Amino acid sequence: MTVYLHDVNRGLGVFLLVVSFLLPGCSSSGGRRASVPVMVDATAQVVEQARQTWLQEHPNWGFHGRAAISQGRDGGSVRVEWEQHGRGYRIVLSAPMSRQSWVLSGSSSGPARLEGVGGWVRVGEVAEQVLFEATGWQVPMGLLPDWVRGRNSGGGDVQLDAEGRPHRVYQRGWQLRFLDWFPSSVGRPVLPRQIEASRGSARIRLIVDQWDELIP
């Protein structure tokens, strides 16, 4: 990705941000077409930088939400309860229709543990692989902690919206779109409300119903 940042009008503090990346095409080759320039003014840049700083300074967080996950013609919906304490996580997934539930826990620097109904347990070094072997779902567990909060980890190609927030992200073969945001509140910046991710035939749509700030 090449990012060109030109000073369009120093007096007005307006900048032209051109993020050169390719969007998925309609062909099977997955070709991309160049994006259009996005105008991001100086005020929006300052606000977004403050938001990114806030995210870095608040590593303990959680949310309640819903997710629709599909792999080709197969898929399902789950309730999601996510708790993140620094690098450690505990995620409860429950599927009301099938009455199944799973608890995925671990750390980004250690093994992952998945517990299911009936007491069975799977343990592995990579959370994404552990979850896939048990459910058949492709979920980028290593990327989600940053994605769900709209945090720029610096590891992908990013297109910003007019507010300077991430709008589309391309990372490790995944395409992510931010569809809606919660407005800022006292002591908390804007946070994603709805995101959608896809890679090949895998699709994930996440809706956050409530954000929680966890006590260290």
Swiss-Prot record:
InterPro entries: LolA/LolB/LppX, OM_lipoprot_LolB
Domain of life: Bacteria
Biological process according to GO: lipoprotein localization to outer membrane; protein transport
Topology with respect to the bilayer: Lipid-anchor
Cellular component, GO annotation: cell outer membrane
Keywords: Cell outer membrane, Chaperone, Lipoprotein, Membrane, Palmitate, Protein transport, Signal, Transport
Lipidation positions, renumbered (N-palmitoyl cysteine): C26
Signal sequence segment: 1-25
Lipid attachment, kind S-diacylglycerol cysteine: C26
Annotated compartments: Cell outer membrane
Oligomer status and interactors: Monomer.
HAMAP family, per the entry: LolB
Role noted for this protein: Plays a critical role in the incorporation of lipoproteins in the outer membrane after they are released by the LolA protein.
Family under the similarity heading: Belongs to the LolB family.
Name of the protein in its database record: Outer-membrane lipoprotein LolB
